[in-house]
Amino acid sequence: MAKLALIRLRSGIRARGEVRDTLAMLRLHRINHLVIVDDTPSYRGMIQKVKDYITWGEIDKETLAKLLRKRGRLIGNKPITDEYVKEKLGMTIEEFAEKVVNGEMKLRDLPNIKPVFRLHPPRGGLKGSKKRSFKEGGALGYRGEKINELIERML
């Protein structure tokens, strides 16, 4: 089962109530926040509802490992370290990221991990308008594998 990375790009100021509720259920409370979810029909429906406020795509194991290493946080705002992952799970961050992407483990199998990753705005800016879809040359919507390039620029 593939893992999807969802990044919120737009504010919810003028959004309908159900869109704001769905963004809250996805834990995307602020702009430039990222969450990792399973590619299931229920999440697909939620993504479809908020497609005008987020961008998403399939994350690969290298990008997930970098994301965990650089932006992953534990409760108390402590960074995720190799020592912590080794102590709790008996593996490195790269091995954990590979198992998460392959569906063998979930992110929450690592105790005390925060489910949201707070990112910087992308270096070089978003390639296009925040009001148009990625297919039309904008920034929103489905990106596929190109989400990894955007995450790299936001780390």
Curated annotation (Swiss-Prot):
One of its GO terms (biological process) is maturation of LSU-rRNA from tricistronic rRNA transcript (SSU-rRNA, 5.8S rRNA, LSU-rRNA). Keywords: Ribonucleoprotein, Ribosomal protein. Gene3D superfamilies: 1.10.15.30, Ribosomal protein L30, ferredoxin-like fold domain. One of its GO terms (cellular component) is cytosolic large ribosomal subunit. InterPro entries: Ribo_uL30_ferredoxin-like_sf, Ribosomal_uL30, Ribosomal_uL30_arc, Ribosomal_uL30_CS, Ribosomal_uL30_euk_arc, Ribosomal_uL30_ferredoxin-like. The keyword Signal does not apply. One of its GO terms (molecular function) is structural constituent of ribosome. PANTHER family: 60S RIBOSOMAL PROTEIN L7, LARGE RIBOSOMAL SUBUNIT PROTEIN UL30. Belongs to the universal ribosomal protein uL30 family. This is Large ribosomal subunit protein uL30. It comes from Thermococcus kodakarensis (strain ATCC BAA-918 / JCM 12380 / KOD1) (Pyrococcus kodakaraensis (strain KOD1)).
